[in-house]
């Protein structure tokens, strides 16, 4: 379960940035997690809850934004956005998204699509309370 490693790394990064002052608490952590990042949101939430115990992030809320998958045609340059929810709802039984992605560019028909967005795993911001 690599979500635990992600949660621990997130807490380490925030603790390093904010220090370990007893009067500092993280209330909300804003993340951007692409549907192709390999991170399963419910597993990350559970792992984070466990990893945060006894840290400045204990009790913090994870506010997660899911950006679209962006495909670019190498022939015509057309970019196509696919919502992460659509892809996640259409995965096959093995959790694969590849079989659902369009095989060709909707604009020119070329089978030359490259994924240029949707793999994000970013710490965007943290809302902190002092005192």
UniProtKB/Swiss-Prot annotation:
Superkingdom as given in the UniProt entry: Bacteria
GO MF term set: nickel cation binding; zinc ion binding
Keyword annotations from UniProtKB, A to Z: Metal-binding, Nickel, Zinc
Chain sites annotated for binding Zn(2+): 73, 76, 105, 108
GO terms classed as biological process: protein maturation; protein modification process
Residues given in the record as Ni(2+) binding sites: 2
Gene3D superfamilies reported in the protein's UniProt record: 3.30.2320.80
Role played: Involved in the maturation of [NiFe] hydrogenases. Required for nickel insertion into the metal center of the hydrogenase.
Family: Belongs to the HypA/HybF family.
Protein name: Hydrogenase maturation factor HypA
Species this chain originates from: Thermomicrobium roseum (strain ATCC 27502 / DSM 5159 / P-2)
């Amino acid at each position: 379960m690599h979500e635990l490693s992600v949660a621990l790394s997130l807490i380490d990064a925030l603790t390093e940035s904010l220090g370990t002052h007893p009067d500092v608490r993280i209330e909300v952590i804003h993340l951007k997690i692409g549907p192709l990042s390999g991170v399963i949101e419910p597993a990350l939430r559970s792992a984070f809850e466990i990893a945060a115990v006894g840290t400045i992030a204990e009790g913090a809320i994870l506010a997660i934004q899911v950006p679209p998958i962006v495909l670019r045609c190498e022939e015509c340059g057309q970019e196509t956005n696919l919502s992460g929810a659509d892809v996640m709802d259409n995965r096959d039984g093995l959790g694969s998204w590849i079989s659902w992605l369009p095989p060709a560019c909707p604009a020119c028909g070329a089978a030359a699509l490259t994924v240029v967005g949707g793999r994000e795993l970013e710490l965007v911001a943290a809302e902190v309370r002092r005192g």
